[in-house]
Amino acid sequence: MSSSTVITNIAALVTNDPSLGDHSPLGLVRDAAVVVEGDRVVWTGESSKAPATDNRVDADGRAVLPGFVDSHSHLLFAGDRTEEFNARMSGRPYSAGGIRTTVAATRAASDAELEAGLTRYLAEALRQGTTTFETKSGYGLTTADESRALRVAARHTDEVTFLGAHIVAPELADDPAAYVDLVTGEMLDACAPHARWIDVFCEKGAFDGDQARAILTAGKARGLHPRIHANQLSYGPGVRLAVELDAASADHCTHLTDADVDALANSRTVATLLPGAEFSTRAQWPDARRLIDAGATVALSTDCNPGSSFTSSVPFCIALAVRDMGMTPDEAVWSATAGGAAALRREDVGRLVPGAYADLTLLDAPSHVHLAYRPGVPLVAGVWRRGVRKV
């Protein structure tokens, strides 16, 4: 039998269970404790009521919240696009290939190089409180390169997404229909065994609504669950397609009609917002307030990728969401934990309740609000993943 540990003297415990504590969506418990046994939470509540345990950890009056759930990232890549970012931020034209630059570098990298990069970024995210990671392929765009990326990812996370439909592969740029046939045929056959999800970039210059529907429908037929890059750069069919196909998440959601917002609010599809992308491209911010007020479920994620959002920091994204997207600190923290779990259709992460994984983030602050109140400050003082302290 596993030994038990109580983490006690917690100033403010975010459980994301509204039946607990202050009965808010965060289920905030003051002067709290958490009991962990093995890889699971077995008890949460007030410190004075905590059961006896084998071990004790003193939180010393600091805040504890669920480990962040980063439900959208692109960590399987090689190369660097510093010059592109520098030119964009300096207002200079830049003619290099964008995603295609990363595709070329990723194809040229060895498996060991891809894995080293992935593990480096995962460790970086873990140090900042992220305990559940989704990541995608999408920088290979050949059957061999997409499938090897997914095999590498599957060694490190259960949340692996096949994104062969990121852009049309450069060698088939003049024949996008042939590339869709490749993605839905040979490439899907090779990639489906290594992924849980299928994704598509539904946007002008990438894949239109009909192409996206064909790709996601083919993936569903192979047992992959759909998610979609939707309505990032322009108004389009992505969000409504996500709802139609019961996608777990529609990601970006910057350009939304009233009908798009209503569709999300009346569905299980989560609107995953990615403020790192807007920060890094100086683009229009998504209107989180509009979505939340309409009743949509919102998640916050990093979109960590080498081109448009090279950050693995969920705390940074929380601060951006509060400052620039109309979210309250409570809403942003919920969206980065329970919201991310909803975007992955998970109930065992993003919450600190009996039966959930013991994924906890300890802050060097008395309240979760400090994540937005003190942007840029390294507040994460400890991280437990599956009951084991990692930081």
UniProtKB/Swiss-Prot annotation:
Residues at which N-formimidoyl-L-glutamate binds: Y139, N305, G307
Pfam family, one: Amidohydro_1
UniProt-annotated binding residues for 4-imidazolone-5-propanoate: R81, Y139, H166, Q232, S308
CDD domains reported in the protein's UniProt record: Imidazolone-5PH (cd01296)
SUPFAM superfamilies: Composite domain of metallo-dependent hydrolases (SSF51338), Metallo-dependent hydrolases (SSF51556)
Claim: Cell wall biogenesis/degradation is one of the keywords in the record: no
Keyword terms of this UniProt record: Cytoplasm, Histidine metabolism, Hydrolase, Iron, Metal-binding, Zinc
Gene Ontology MF: a single term: iron ion binding
Catalytic activity entry: 4-imidazolone-5-propanoate + H2O = N-formimidoyl-L-glutamate
Cofactor notes: Binds 1 zinc or iron ion per subunit.
Cofactor(s) recorded in Swiss-Prot or TrEMBL: Zn(2+); Fe(3+)
Residues holding Fe(3+): H72, H74, H229, D303
Any Gene Ontology biological process: L-histidine catabolic process to glutamate and formate
EC number: 3.5.2.7
Family: Belongs to the metallo-dependent hydrolases superfamily. HutI family.
Protein name (database record): Imidazolonepropionase
Organism of this sequence: Streptomyces coelicolor (strain ATCC BAA-471 / A3(2) / M145)
Encoding gene (name): hutI
